[in-house]
């Protein structure tokens, strides 16, 4: 009982601090200018934009727009299952209408939140499979690009625990660590940020990012 109260008090304190910081940031804005790019957005959910490695002229994003592959509607959002789309800039540096990936990356399930190696040839992404008579878990997959096409995605063997979700991959610039979200045991709260060492042979050890990053609540989208 006292542990639950302590967690709630901690989250309440973070909430109050966030409100104070928001007011401070409004009074002292940065020089960044945020603009809406109409051609990239739809009337559905569009999120998790990511450049294809070091190429600033190819943008990937997650979307539930009508062109997404799955036929079933999400029971929570009422929208189609998300897929990964990409857009390119033309010779005038204008973004083109996003198109779904023409590969096995997208399926009838949820795909999204992708991350790339610096050379743009390796892509990690989240897939949430919903199977009859089985619980739904988020999993991280990897696909390799050969030429213009992405290869058949393979599930990343990050955990031996089959009851925990892993999602929202973010590859470090050097490609030696993969950051992700998980509800696996041993964290600070519900969902925590973790990282795993990426080696030539696959994956190494898993680390929790600790109390400096994680709280008793949920952390997502590293």
What spans do the regions from the language model cover?
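Short, conserved micro-motifs composed of acidic
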Residues: 3-222
């Amino acid at each position: 009982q006292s542990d639950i109260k302590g967690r709630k008090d901690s989250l309440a304190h973070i909430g109050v601090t966030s409100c104070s910081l928001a007011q401070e940031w409004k009074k002292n804005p940065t020089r960044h200018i945020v603009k809406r790019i109409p051609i990239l957005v739809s009337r559905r959910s569009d999120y998790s934009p990511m450049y294809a490695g070091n190429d600033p002229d190819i943008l990937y994003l997650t979307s539930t727009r009508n062109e997404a592959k799955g036929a079933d509607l999400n029971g929570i959002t009422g929208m189609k299952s998300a897929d990964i789309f990409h857009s390119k800039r033309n010779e005038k540096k204008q973004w083109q209408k996003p198109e779904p990936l023409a590969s096995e990356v997208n399926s009838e399930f949820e795909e999204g939140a992708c991350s790339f190696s610096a050379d743009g040839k390796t892509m990690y992404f989240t897939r949430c499979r919903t199977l009859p008579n089985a619980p739904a878990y988020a999993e991280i997959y990897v696909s390799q690009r050969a030429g213009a096409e992405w290869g058949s995605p393979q599930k990343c063997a990050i955990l031996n625990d089959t009851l925990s979700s892993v999602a929202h991959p973010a590859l470090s610039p050097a490609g030696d660590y993969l950051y992700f979200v998980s509800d696996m045991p041993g964290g600070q709260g519900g969902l925590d940020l973790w990282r795993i060492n990426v080696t030539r042979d696959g994956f190494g050890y898993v680390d929790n990012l600790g109390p400096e990053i994680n709280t008793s609540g949920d952390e997502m989208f590293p």
